[in-house]
UniProtKB/Swiss-Prot annotation:
InterPro entries: Ribosomal_uS11, Ribosomal_uS11_bac-type, Ribosomal_uS11_CS, Ribosomal_uS11_sf. One of its GO terms (molecular function) is rRNA binding. It comes from Mycolicibacterium vanbaalenii (strain DSM 7251 / JCM 13017 / BCRC 16820 / KCTC 9966 / NRRL B-24157 / PYR-1). The keyword Metal-binding does not apply. It comes from the Bacteria. Keywords: Ribonucleoprotein, Ribosomal protein, RNA-binding, rRNA-binding. Part of the 30S ribosomal subunit. Interacts with proteins S7 and S18. Binds to IF-3. Residues 8-21 have a biased composition (Basic residues). The gene is rpsK. This is Small ribosomal subunit protein uS11.
């Protein structure tokens, strides 16, 4: 017998619970910039995500996700969502080697968020995993 699943999309006529507006004046912006995508998450001081956006979420596909312009739009989108929750000041944590790092920080400032400390938290291996092989074009 098939059992009813919990969660999922609400059925027609059912009321959905509206996500409550948090009032967080100070937060942290985590920018993860890889070679393929850029993800911007804005969290409260405890680390709970308030707003997020990524290059793919904004509407880019394929190799265009890795461009600085896509990172700029993702950061603006996340900043706009976070400002609805009352975020005014953020500390920025940047991770990864991607091309959208600086652009994302600049667009957070341009969107109206006050940027405090900027720190690079890219993980450095102490000779851990073998890196991918060199590309030969």
């Amino acid at each position: 017998m098939a059992q009813a699943k919990k969660g999922g999309a609400p059925k027609k006529g059912q009321k959905t619970r509206r996500r409550e507006k948090k009032n967080v004046p100070h937060g942290a912006a985590h920018i993860k910039s890889t070679f393929n995508n850029t993800i911007v998450s804005i969290t409260d001081p405890q680390g709970n995500v308030i707003a997020w956006a990524s290059s793919g979420h904004v509407g880019f596909k394929g190799s265009r996700k890795s461009t600085p312009f896509a990172a700029q739009l993702a950061a603006e989108n996340a900043a706009r969502k976070a400002q609805e929750h009352g975020v005014k000041k953020v500390d920025v944590f940047v991770k990864g080697p991607g091309s959208g790092r600086e652009t994302a920080i600049r667009s957070l400032q341009a969107a109206g968020l006050e940027v405090g400390a900027i720190s690079d938290v890219t993980p450095q291996p102490h000779n851990g995993c073998r890196p991918p092989k060199r590309r030969r074009v």
